[in-house]
Amino acid sequence: MTQPIARSIPLQVVSGDTAAPASLQTGVKQIGGDKINRSPVQFVDAPVLRKPSWIRVRIPSGNAVQNLKAKLRENRLVTVCEEASCPNIHECFSHGTATFMILGEVCTRRCSFCDVAHGRPKPPDASEPTSLATTVADMGLKYVVVTSVDRDDLRDGGAQHFVDCISAIRASAPKTRIEILTPDFRGKGRMDRALEILATSPPDVFNHNIETVPDLYPNVRPGADYQWSLTLLQRFKAQHPTIATKSGIMLGLGETMEQVQATLRDLRAHDVDMITIGQYLQPTPHHHPVMRYWTPEEYKALEDYGNALGFSHVASGPMVRSSYHADRQAAGAGVAA
């Protein structure tokens, strides 16, 4: 059996700068240290763990990646694959698949694990749904994932823009199955408004990531709430019993096996059908450090545990990401393509 690497490392968390942050200009991206330095928590004196042999990404040859990037730029579209520095980008792009990120490239949150830029976003682009639908149809995609940055500046959290994109894709590519990976729509009345809007044109799969165990939320997802995310998933399922719900969790942020298992139980108790479990990788030295690399055997144990809980599909492995092989995950859960 593969031995675990560095079961834990010391981590000192300190409060961020208490001085009032400089005002942000609309559309300006804050990335890396500029973003994390505005976070309410900072990480200091954390040693860097060496990546184990099972954390490896094969870079395929050929022009498929550049061709797809050119098509995206031509239509002024953004993928979370690029913005979040996903390690699977070359594999997915080489197969002509991508997870499209709508509502801009600037997020209103400052999560310590995420490489997407922070700042004050621009207003939604009214032409984006049409551009997205045209690209999906041109690529002949059978399955598409649509996600977004957090848009706490919008009254509905961006729900109407999601619906506009779903409707446009269905008009241009009626056979394409659509998965949406949404933010939490947190805020007074925002979840109610978002769910009401999404009901007008629901997706084939509704995905919202829980990301980590509840005890780590203050350091990993400042601005989010564990129970709020569970409630969002449960309420969508209650409104749409026949639509698959999905969530994802990262490992390596300091959680224990028992905490992960408890989170899986919580997700099933809130009627989540599908789950993805993968290794967190630090995007830059400024982000939350990797506390531990979980072994392939542990991922297999969690897969078995999730299956025993009754998830319709469990994708568990070091390089698994929420939208990685999403079409295969959906097919495994009975969502026809």
Curated annotation (Swiss-Prot):
Query: Where primarily located?
Result: cytoplasm
Q: Name one GO molecular function term.
A: lipoate synthase activity
Q: Which reaction does it catalyse?
A: [[Fe-S] cluster scaffold protein carrying a second [4Fe-4S](2+) cluster] + N(6)-octanoyl-L-lysyl-[protein] + 2 oxidized [2Fe-2S]-[ferredoxin] + 2 S-adenosyl-L-methionine + 4 H(+) = [[Fe-S] cluster scaffold protein] + N(6)-[(R)-dihydrolipoyl]-L-lysyl-[protein] + 4 Fe(3+) + 2 hydrogen sulfide + 2 5'-deoxyadenosine + 2 L-methionine + 2 reduced [2Fe-2S]-[ferredoxin]
Residues reported in the UniProt entry to bind [4Fe-4S] cluster 2: C107, C111, C114
Question: Which GO cellular component terms, listed alphabetically, does the Swiss-Prot or TrEMBL entry include?
Answer: cytoplasm
Note describing how the cofactor binds = Binds 2 [4Fe-4S] clusters per subunit. One cluster is coordinated with 3 cysteines and an exchangeable S-adenosyl-L-methionine.
Q: Where in the numbering of this chain does the Radical SAM core domain appear? A: 93-312
Domain of life assignment:
Bacteria
The family assignment reads:
Belongs to the radical SAM superfamily. Lipoyl synthase family.
Q: What is the protein name stated in its UniProt record?
A: Lipoyl synthase
Q: Which source organism?
A: Xanthomonas campestris pv. campestris (strain B100)
